[in-house]
Design a protein with these regions (language model features):
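Conserved acetyl-CoA-binding loop-helix of GNAT-fold acetyltransferases
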Residues: 93-108, 250, 256-269, 273
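Short hairpin/turn module used for nucleic-acid contact or packing/dimerization
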Residues: 256, 263-310
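Conserved hydrophobic beta-strand within the GNAT/NAT acetyltransferase core sheet
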Residues: 118-121, 245, 279-283
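A short beta-loop-alpha structural element at the N-terminal edge
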Residues: 1-16, 25-29, 161-176, 181
Length: 310
């Protein structure tokens, strides 16, 4: 096996390999939308951070990553990077070996640039890719899931009010957003978030970059919310027929009473009426509350894994 820096002349072949990998995942998750081509593969040739693998002068895989950033993945002071779904691919034969050899070369590139942590989004049903990275010290951090925009069951809490919150009323649920942040700070999530970062996030979500649906009790108090956006964490989430959940919270005293399930049903029925066909969600796999809830109604299609290089 030989290796070259991923260049523009390799992009179309890399795109074909990436598309084959996506089609494999679609066999396991038929809800995934059809695509003609994998977008933005050229980024990993343009930034000089990609590696291509060859057997007998035929490309068998590639691996790239985004430009690094500081304080990545809550490792304060560390420079880290991420390889998205469109940033890698490998043929089926010898896939474990191909990915492991690619990572060896990619890690050398990263270390030379001072990049000390590396994350990559893998397809959830690609056992060979997961084996390759798990054996090399990676652990799961996040997951993306998808479902058809179809009912999950009749609303049980008929006494609750389900509605879309107007932008001017977003401050009503600021405390719930802060409670969600506090939940993610605790064990076993331990996601770091400074007061400044929290303030910036609240300003962003209250600026109108999303739609927010809420469940209200008989006293008018908001018991739960779900944020919806038109953008996902990967190219799949940008499909025009798809909408994505980007934040969910239910006050603790009303958990286990089908409040969040009923709100999700309301959201699904609303979006279906508007013509949307797919619903996605991403979450930290270190959040057991999210893990238990979302897997009941959604199917995994990605598994994002992370490790420190040095």
């Amino acid at each position: 096996m030989t290796f070259k820096k991923l260049s523009k002349e390799h992009v179309e072949e890399a795109r074909k390999i990436a598309l084959c990998n996506y089609e494999e995942e679609r066999l396991a998750v038929p809800e995934l939308p059809a695509v003609d081509s994998i977008p933005m593969v050229e980024l990993f040739a343009e930034n000089g951070l990609g590696i291509a693998a060859f057997e007998n002068d035929k490309m068998v895989g590639f691996l790239g990553c985004f430009e690094p950033w500081i304080d990545a993945f809550d490792f304060l002071g560390d420079k880290g990077t991420f390889c998205p779904l469109m940033g890698h691919g490998a043929v089926k034969e010898n896939r474990v070996l191909i990915y492991q050899k690619l990572f060896e070369k990619e890690a050398e590139v990263c270390v030379a640039k001072g990049i000390s942590s590396f994350a990559i989004a893998l397809y959830a049903h690609d056992s060979e890719a997961k084996q390759a990275f798990f054996e090399y010290g990676f652990g799961q951090r996040c997951a993306d899931k998808i479902r058809p925009m179809e009912s999950i069951g009749e609303i049980k809490n008929k006494n609750l009010v389900f509605e879309e919150l107007e932008l001017s009323r977003f401050p009503e649920i600021r405390n719930l957003r802060i409670d969600l942040n506090n939940h993610l700070l605790k064990s076993p999530c331990f996601l770091k978030c400074s007061d400044e970062e929290l303030g910036d996030w609240l300003e962003k979500v209250e600026s109108g970059d999303r739609r927010t649906f809420v469940a209200r009790g008989t006293d008018g108090k908001v018991l739960a919310y779900i944020d919806i956006t038109g953008e996902g964490e990967n190219f799949v989430g940008y499909d025009k027929k798809m909408r994505n959940i980007h934040g969910t919270y239910c006050v603790p005293e009303f958990r286990g009473q089908n409040v969040i399930q009923d709100l999700l049903e309301h959201v699904i029925l609303t979006l279906k009426t508007e013509g949307f066909e797919l619903l996605g969600v991403d979450h930290e796999s270190t959040n057991p509350t999210a893990n238990r809830f979302w897997r009941k109604y959604f199917t995994d299609y990605t598994c994002s894994v992370l490790r420190k290089i040095f």
